Amino acid sequence: MTDNDRKINQLRAKIPTFRCIKGCHDCCGPVTVSSEEMARLPVKSNAEHDAALNELSCAYLGAHGCEIYDQRPLICRLFGTTPSLLCPNGQRPEYMIDVKVEREIHAFLGATRQVLL
């Protein structure tokens, strides 16, 4: 396990969780993720990525929601947990993410090689 893999795991543990509304995919748009996070995910074809991008969607959004929910990237986990990425349906954790943790996540994302999900 690399230092970045350990850091990803550490940061994930600090992000609060909440229950999404079934069928909502508002957070499932095209985003960039660290190459380390991308390496954890099943490989999608270029055609699958292109089709999703044409719909301004995520290649991992399936008919029943996120196909990679347990391995979803940090940016996906942040959605709805911070005032800067509020859920438009009003869903949120009991306590929003600590501002220091959010800054730490953004610093990590800024310091790592980003690729389009």
Task: For the regions a language model picked out, list residue spans one by one.
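Short loop/turn segments that flank or connect secondary-structure elements
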Residues: M1-L117
